[in-house]
Amino acid sequence: MAVAVRTLQEQLEKAKESLKNVDENIRKLTGRDPNDVRPIQARLLALSGPGGGRGRGSLLLRRGFSDSGGGPPAKQRDLEGAVSRLGGERRTRRESRQESDPEDDDVKKPALQSSVVATSKERSTERPLFQDQNTDEKETPERPGPIFGLLMGTLQKFKQESTVATERQKRRQEIEQKLEVQAEEERKQVENERRELFEERRAKQTELRLLEQKVELAQLQEEWNEHNAKIIKYIRTKTKPHLFYIPGRMCPAPKLIEESQRKTNALFEGRRIEFAEQINKMEARPRRQSMKEKEHQVVVRNEEQKSEQEEGKVAPRTRVMLRALDDLVARVGTPSPRRGSGEEEEKEIPIVHSDAEKEQEEEEQKQEMEVKMEEETEVRESEKQQDSQPEEVMDVLEMVESVKNVIAEQEVMETNQVERVEPSENEASKELEPEMEFEIEPDKECKSLSPGKENASTLEMENEPEEKEEKESEPQPEPMAQPQAQSLPQPQPQRHRQSQSQPQQYSSPPPLSQPETLPLAVSQPPPQLIQRQGHLPPERKEFLVESVKLTEVPTEPVLTVHSESKYETKTRSRSRGRARNRTSKSRSRSSSSSSSSSSSTSSSSGSSSSSGSSSSRTSSSSSSTSGSSSRDSSSSTTSSSESRSRSRGRGHNRDRKHRRSVDRKRRDASGLERSHKSAKGGSSRDAKAVSSSGMPRFKPGQL
């Protein structure tokens, strides 16, 4: 504490010295000491009087003093001397003016040109006018010459004096103006210096007063510390007023002493802190504005750093979410539904009119899936580049939720399908066995079939789309009847899988890879699950054929298709418009391919039963007919009854055959190449399935 007092005293001495220097500068500039106080009488004289201060009142007072002779004798002498001096100066000025008046008048007065004017003489009326004129003429030559010269000389002299006077006056005015400007500048400079000095003096005085207060406070604090240092050895009572005492014997008293010392030390420390804060506040008054600006800058920097840290944390979080989403997609085997997940989940199921059209639609769906996969990979790459943006976190969370929903829906559909497949076997044995005949279109070498059979088969295949359209026009069932309808067997897609076992024996299969006719009775899942299976991995796409029974090949091909209007759900009714557009585009292709396949079906079936053209077909048919002979009669009766109903509309389709024959020829070539690929891919899988289980197992990927 003593050190603080010394430093404050040193600062106080320095401030006093600087104040003295400022006072000396003011004394030099103004001629008086700023610390001196003016006499009270001078102030009273200046303030009293009729004029009320300066001006005429002061002059009247001075006159009264000089006239009355009042006041102190020293003042009287000064006033008399001043008056005499002023009076003497005035007299000398007047005398000098009187002496120099003529000259000054010549200089100051404007020069006038003198002119001699002849006075008119009084003419007597007695003499005539012409006599007077004659006398004038006589007198003019007698005029003396020196008078005219004197006049001219005076005039010229006046003119010269006037010009000289004007030049002198101009020079004098210029000099006076320069002097006035210089005097004004000096006066302003003196005023500025004086103002600056007085401002500096005020600042020094305030600093001096502040230092004096600090020194005084420091001295008081030091005295207080000395006093408390003496008291600290004693015990302070808890009650007020506090008393300090010390016991004669120290029993438990040392504890009390320590506690008292601790409290007093805390009190001292608090007092020291308050003292330091007070001094800092006194020093920080001029710097308050600058400190506020610095604090504001620090706050702004901290906010910027926090925002940068938050942005840096968000980017890794988005990367982690994207990785988790990719893992889920890899487990399920479906493409990640980035951005367009809602569209893929809400994909509507098209209406299947015939097996040929269904195969064509499945191929189109595969192409669409490939295009979507490519688009989603591009979206993935673009989103990986934008991982640093915090907005992607919400998108990723939504995507993960959508993927989980899709997985849950698929699992529910699978469990429902397993439950529906078992009762469908019993129902299939009781109901009519649908028969569906497909055959690969023969090569150019195998085109020696009868035209009558071809026409009949084409008419049967063309009747199929019309029957489907008639069934679609029927009213949709209520939503409550959907679970019952979905439990019924649907043989069409499974027949596709069954028909894939024999396409390898031909060199030129049709565009849709339709194999030889095999009437099947298969428990088929509902079309919703078939549409879902397009997104599932191959392990979940397999369906076991529950009962496959081959019948004898009939002489006339029969085509039976169950109406699927009972199995349509609300989503399928919404998609009817889209399905019609899609089927109308592919109707020409499917009808031509179906007609050609049906014609080839009848010929190949006849040839297989009579001549045994294909050893593989005959072997498979002979092995399968032994197990299915019990149901031949029922299937033949049902097929004949259904063929009768279809034969009614054959007359309407004859006109279509001529129009579609041209399209069929064009698409034969493109369909051959496609069927080669599908036949090669499906043959190896079918052979494994037949050899392992005895019954063929088919996958939707072969369609």
Curated annotation (Swiss-Prot):
PTM sites of type Phosphoserine:
48, 58, 66, 96, 100, 114-115, 354, 382, 388, 450, 457, 565, 670, 691
User: Which residues does this entry mark as bearing N6-succinyllysine?
Assistant: K240
Q: Which residues carry this modification: Phosphothreonine?
A: T125
Residues in coiled coil: 2-32, 165-236, 354-411
InterPro entries found in the cross-reference section: Pinin (IPR039853), Pinin_SDK_MemA (IPR006786), Pinin_SDK_N (IPR006787)
Q: Where is this cross-link: Glycyl lysine isopeptide (Lys-Gly) (interchain with G-Cter in SUMO1)?
A: K159
For region Disordered, the annotated ranges are: 46-148, 284-314, 331-394, 408-703
- Sufficient for PSAP complex assembly: region residues: 223-285
GO annotations of cellular component type: catalytic step 2 spliceosome; desmosome; nuclear speck
Annotated signal sequence range = none
GO molecular-function terms, A-Z? DNA binding
Report biased composition (Low complexity) as residue ranges. 479-489, 589-642
Question: Which residues are recorded with the post-translational modification Omega-N-methylarginine?
Answer: R54
Modification N-acetylalanine, positions? A2
Composition-biased stretches, type Basic and acidic residues, lie in 87-100, 348-357, 366-386, 417-433, 665-676
List UniProt keywords, sorted A-Z.
Answer: Acetylation, Activator, Cell junction, Coiled coil, DNA-binding, Isopeptide bond, Methylation, mRNA processing, mRNA splicing, Nucleus, Phosphoprotein, Spliceosome, Transcription, Transcription regulation, Ubl conjugation
Compartments in which it is found: Nucleus speckle; Cell junction, Desmosome
Task: Respond yes or no to whether keyword tRNA processing is given for this record.
Answer: no
In the record, the note on similarity to other proteins reads: Belongs to the pinin family.
What's this chain's function? Transcriptional activator binding to the E-box 1 core sequence of the E-cadherin promoter gene; the core-binding sequence is 5'CAGGTG-3'. Capable of reversing CTBP1-mediated transcription repression. Auxiliary component of the splicing-dependent multiprotein exon junction complex (EJC) deposited at splice junction on mRNAs. The EJC is a dynamic structure consisting of core proteins and several peripheral nuclear and cytoplasmic associated factors that join the complex only transiently either during EJC assembly or during subsequent mRNA metabolism.
Its recorded name reads Pinin
